Curated annotation (Swiss-Prot):
The active site is at 1004 (nucleophile), 1124 (proton acceptor). A nucleoside 3',5'-cyclic phosphate 1 binds at residues 186-313. Pfam families: cNMP_binding, NTE_Ploop, Patatin. This is Patatin-like phospholipase domain-containing protein 6. It comes from Pongo abelii (Sumatran orangutan). It is found in: Endoplasmic reticulum membrane. A nucleoside 3',5'-cyclic phosphate 3 binds at residues 620-740. The gene is PNPLA6. Its main location: endoplasmic reticulum. Residues 1303-1319 have a biased composition (Acidic residues). Inhibited by a series a OPs such as mipafox (MPX), phenyl saligenin phosphate (PSP), phenyl dipentyl phosphinate (PDPP), diisopropyl fluorophosphate and paraoxon. Belongs to the NTE family.
Amino acid sequence: MGTSSHGLATNSSGAKVAERDGFQDVPAPGEGAAGRICGAQPVPFVPQVLGVMIGAGVAVVVTAVLILLVVRRLRVPKTPAPDGPRYRFRKRDKVLFYGRKIMRKVSQSTSSLVDTSVSATSRPRMKKKLKMLNIAKKILRIQKETPTLQRKEPPPAVLEADLTEGDLANSHLPSEVLYMFKNVRVLGHFEKPLFLELCRHMVFQRLGQGDYVFRPGQPDASIYVVQDGLLELCLPGPDGKECVVKEVVPGDSVNSLLSILDVITGHQHPQRTVSARAARDSTVLRLPVEAFSAVFAKYPESLVRVVQIIMVRLQRVTFLALHNYLGLTNELFSHEIQPLRLFPSPGLPTRTSPVRGSKRMVSTSATDEPRETPGRPPDPTGAPLPGPTGDPVKPTSLETPSAPLLSRCVSMPGDISGLQGGPRSDFDMAYERGRISVSLQEGASGGSLAAPARTPTQEPREQPAGACEYSYCEDESATGGCPFGPYQGRQTSSIFEAAKRELAKLMRIEDPSLLNSRVLLHHAKAGTIIARQGDQDVSLHFVLWGCLHVYQHMIDKAEDVCLFVAQPGELVGQLAVLTGEPLIFTLRAQRDCTFLRISKSDFYEIMRAQPSVVLSAAHTVAARMSPFVRQMDFAIDWTAVEAGRALYRQGDRSDCTYIVLNGRLRSVIQRGSGKKELVGEYGRGDLIGVVEALTRQPRATTVHAVRDTELAKLPEGTLGHIKRRHPQVVTRLIHLLSQKILGNLQQLQGPFPGSGLGVPPHSELTNPASNLATVAVLPVCAEVPMVAFTLELQHALQAIGPTLLLNSDIIRARLGASALDSIQEFRLSGWLAQQEDAHRIVLYQTDASLTPWTVRCLRQADCILIVGLGDQEPTLGQLEQMLENTAVRALKQLVLLHREEGAGPTRTVEWLNMRSWCSGHPHLRCPRRLFSRRSPAKLHELYEKVFSRRADRHSDFSRLARVLTGNTIALVLGGGGARGCSHIGVLKALEEAGVPVDLVGGTSIGSFIGALYAEERSASRTKQRAREWAKSMTSVLEPVLDLTYPVTSMFTGSAFNRSIHRVFQDKQIEDLWLPYFNVTTDITASAMRVHKDGSLWRYVRASMTLSGYLPPLCDPKDGHLLMDGGYINNLPADIARSMGAKTVIAIDVGSQDETDLSTYGDSLSGWWLLWKRLNPWADKVKVPDMAEIQSRLAYVSCVRQLEVVKSSSYCEYLRPPIDCFKTMDFGKFDQVYDVGYQYGKAVFGGWSRGNVIEKMLTDRRSTDLNESRRADVLAYPSSGFTDLAEIVSRIEPPTSYVSDGCADGEESDCLTEYEEDAGPDCSRDEGGSPEGASPSTASEMEEEKSILRQRRCLPQEPPGSATDA
C-alpha cells in the first residue's frame, strides 16, 4: 500500500487521480477508473496550494517558537566563575577513557574463561563476566552496519560440463574391453570376472563402405560396437526400399536384447527385417551371444540377474518410449500365438454345471467389476492358509523386519538387528530387484530349496469377490471332495495335478515337486478383474479354461484398449514378476475362467532352486512381443552419461530425443555475452529435446549430467519410421508439442516476453528441488543431531511417498562389512540404483568425516542439505571445507535448525556469506525430541512411537519434505489498500481448513501482510500486529507534519517509514520463517524487481510507494528507484510458480475496472462535460479524465498479467467481496477482516468437501509418472498451431537403397517375424473349451469375436504408404 502513515495518502493498490469539484480521488495500484468502488464517492484531500500554505504556516510557527526559546536563554543571568583553575575532560578523552575501561573488562573476562581450573565458588562470578562480555559485544556491534547478502554466481562445476572424455589409459584393462563395457548397457550389470570371461570371445571386424554387418536371413547372434566409422541400421519401407532409422556413430552399439534373450533361451531365429551396413570404412567390435551361455554355465546365479535386466530394459526403455510417450498400445503385442490345448484330454472329465449351492461360488455381475485380491483366502477345510512371504510393511511402521523389505520399508541405524550381515549374491540382487524380501536362512545358504514350511502366524487375506480358490488337500478323503468351478470333488484334484504337470512342462521345471504348496487353483466369475494396471503385488497366471483379456489404459484418453487375449496354456504377468515393476495392464475375465496362480515370492523361490526357470518365463514374454517391438529394440538405445559429461552442447544438431530413466541432468544456456545461466534440471521420467528434434533446430542449451544417468535414446529416423508405420502417432506428437508451445505462449502473454520480467520463461524448470530422487544430508559440525534429523525428515517424507534412509551402518548390515570397499563398487552402485527405483526418494546420511561412504553420498545426490544449528556462531565445518574444494555438481541448500522455545532466526546472511552459492536456506523449528540426548536404543524406541503417527502437515519438516518433492503450496497476496485487511481473515480460515503454506509473496498491502505472516506463521498474531499498524494509519497529525514542497511527492515519506520500521524493526528477509518475496517497479531500469533478500521494512515500503505521494525508495544495493509493485504485477502468482510452487493460492483485493463508459463520438468538448456535470437534469456521462487515463495506461500490464494468472491451471484464484470498502478505510479493520474470514470459511469448506485440499497435498509423481510435465528448454515464439501438424507429421523420404533381402512382392514377409510362432488369432475357437459344453458357448464365441474386433484385438490390415501418413 503506497501511502505514508497519515490519513491523507492512499493505498498502493491503486493510483488514479481524478479532479472533480475541487477534490481528487487517488486509488491504489490495480484500481480502475471512476466507479470502481461500489459507488463510493471520491475521497477529498488537501489541494497542492492549500498544502503549501499549511506548510508555510507551520514553518512560521516553529520559527517563532525557536526565537522565543533563544531569547529566554539569553536573558538568564550568568553566575560568576569561582577563582582558581577548572579542569574538565575533553569529549574525545572521555570516550577513550570509557572505551579502555570496557576493553579491560572484556580482556579480563576472556582470560578468565580460558582458565579451565575454575572452582565451583567462582561460577557465579564467571556468569556475571559472561553477561558483561555479551553486553560489551552488543555495544560494540551497534556501530556495525547490518550485513547484506553477497551476490554469488553458481560455481563453474554447476554450470559447465567437463571438456575431457574418460581416460581409458589409466585403466589396466585393454581399451577395447573398456569400450565394450561402457557402450553396451547390459554388460554394465555384469561383475568384473563375468565380464572378462565374456571379453575372451570378442573379435574385431573391419568393414568397407557398403559392406553389410548383417542382413535379413542371417543369424542375429552378436553384439556390435562401432569403434570408428559409421554404420546405418535399416528397415524395409513400404515400397521395398531400405529406410535408415538409426546412424550408429563411434561409441554406439547395434544389438537387440530380445535377440540375446532368444539365443540364451535356445529359440534363436534369423533376421527377418533388420539390416546394418557400413556407410563408410568402419571397425566394429563383435561379441557373439553364444558366449553368454558359456558364462552362465559357469555362473548360474548370474543368469536370473541378467535376464531380469533385459526385462527391465524392455519395460522401461521400449515400453516407456513407445507407449507412454508415443501412445502405442496393442501395436506392441503379437495377437498370433499358439496356445496349449489342455482340456479336454484323455482321462479328464467333461464339463459339468457349477454347483450353485457351493459357498465358494460368489455371484457377481460383470458390471460390478469385482476384483480378485492376489492372496490366499482361508482353506476350505477351515484351517487358515498363510499369505505369501514378503507382505509389505505399512509406510508408517517402524517394526523391526525379519528381512530387509524394499517396498515402502523404514530403515534406521538402530534397526539393523534383523538385516543380513554378509555380502549378497547375484540372486539376492535379483530378489531385491523384484522387490522380494530375502530371508536370512535362504540368503545364507544360497543352495537349492525344498518347499518351505509356511509360517502359521501370517494372517490370511480377504476372500476375493467373484472368484474362488482351491488349494490341494493332502487328505482328500477327509474332506469328501471339494466342488470347484465346473468340476467337483476329486475331479478338481485330477485337474489340479494335470495342470501342474503342464505348467512344469511349459516352464521346464525338472523337479515338479517345486510347485507343491506354491501353486493355487483359481476360478473367476465373468467380469472379475484379476489384477489392475499399476498393481505392485503381482503374480503369474496360467490359464487353464476360458480366457483372460488383457487391457491397457490409453494415454490421454479415459478408455482401455484390449492388447491381447490369453488363451488356455498361456502365462500372464511374468514381465512384472521378473522386473519388480508395477503391472502395465489390467487382467479381466470376460467369461468364467480357471487358472493357476503363483505369487511373486513363490516364483522366486522356484528360481532359486532352478535358475533356468527364468529362461522359460522370459521366452514367453519375448514370444508375445510384436515384430514391430523387435525392430524398435534395435533402434531405441539404452545409453548412460557419466557425471559431468555433456549429453549434448548448445548449437549441436538435433537428431534424437531422450527420456531420463534414472539420474539427473542440468540444462545451461550461454548468452551472447558469454554468461552462462541455469535453465533447469531434469529427473526420472522427463522428456528432453523433443521440440528441438521435431522442429529440426540446433540445440538451444547444453545439457550435462549432474550424476551418473541412464537414458533412453529415440533417434530421429526411428521416429520417422514409426510415423510411417503407425500414423496415429502424429496425434500424440501434436499433443506433446502443443503442450510445450502452449506453455511458451502463456509465458509470452505477460506484459513483457520471455524473461524480461526477471522471471525465467519456464516455471517448473526453475525449481532446483523439482523431481528429486536422492538427497544427501551433510552436518556442519558434530553437534548437529544427524540421526534424529534424518529420521524426522524421513517421517515427513513418508506421508508423500515411500522413503528410504541409508547410512554407512545400514549399508554394512545389508550388504556386508566389505560393501564400501572399492572392489564392491559395482555391486553397491547396482543396489543403490534399485533403491531409487523402489522408493520415491532416498536419503543419504553422510559420516562426520570424509569417508568412502561420504564420497558415495555426494556422488549419488541430486541435492545436498547442509545442516547447521541456528543458535550457534556462523561457521564453516571441516567437511564443508573439503566439499568447497571439490567439484560437486549437485545443488546445495543450507538448513538451519532452531529450538522450539528459542528465538527466531538471526544472522542468516552471515551463514550464507561464508559459503559458496546455495539454492535455498530453509529455517526449521524443531521439536524438543530432536535435541534430546538419548542412547541409540532409546532413540529407536522414541521414533517407533513417532512413526506410528502421521506427520503434522504444518510442521517445518513437512514443509521441507514438500519442497524436496516439488509439492510446494504458495500463498500470494495482492494489493488493494485497506481492503487488504481481508487477507488476514482468509489466512485464518486457511489455517482452520488445514492448508499448509510453504511460500509467501505479495505486492503493496499484500507484501506487508505476507511479511507479517512469514515472520509469525500465525494468523492470530498477524492480525494483532496488523491492527495496531492500521490504527496508526488513521492519524491526521503525522501526515500534516510530513508535508513538503511537492516536487517529487507531497510527503517526505519519513512518517510512513517510521510506521513500517516500528513493525519490522531491522529484520532481514533471510531471517523469516517462511520463504518470502515481494514485487516492486524499478523506474530506473523500467522493469519489475523481485526481492527475496535484504532489508525487510525497506522493500515492503518500496512495494507500498504510491506515485505522487511518497518518493521512490532508493535500493540500498544498486541505488535504483523503486515504486509500488502494483503498477506492473499486482498479483504475482507467476513469480511464486517460477520459484517452484506446485499450487498457488492467489487472493486478489484490487478494485474492479469500470468498463461501462459512455460513447461520445470522434471528438469531445470539455465544456459539454462541464455542462453535463453542473446540470442536475442532464444524463450523467462516464468519461475518464486525464488523471484516470494516465492511471489506466500505467496499469495496462498489471491487468494483462492478472488475466493470465486467473486463467492458469496452477492458480487457485480467490476474491473476497470487499468492493464496498474504500482504499483508506483502515478504521474499518475488523469489518474488512470479518468479510475475508467468512468468505474463506465458505471457500475452504467447499474445498474440504470436494477433496481439493488432499489433491493439493498429493505427490504429482505418484498420480501419473507417465505424464510429460516439463516445458522444453527450447522456445520458439514464432511457432504457432498453424504449422504444428506440418512439423510433427513431416516424414522424410527413406534412403533409396534397394534391399536385397526382400522384393516388392515380399513385403508381408519382411514385416512379419517368427512365422513359425504364428497360429490362430485371438478370435479363433478356444482350444480349452471342454467337450460337452452348453449350446450357448457358440454364441458366446461369436459375441467375443465382435468385441475383440471392436477393441482392435484382431490383426489389422498393414498400414498405408508414407503418403497416407
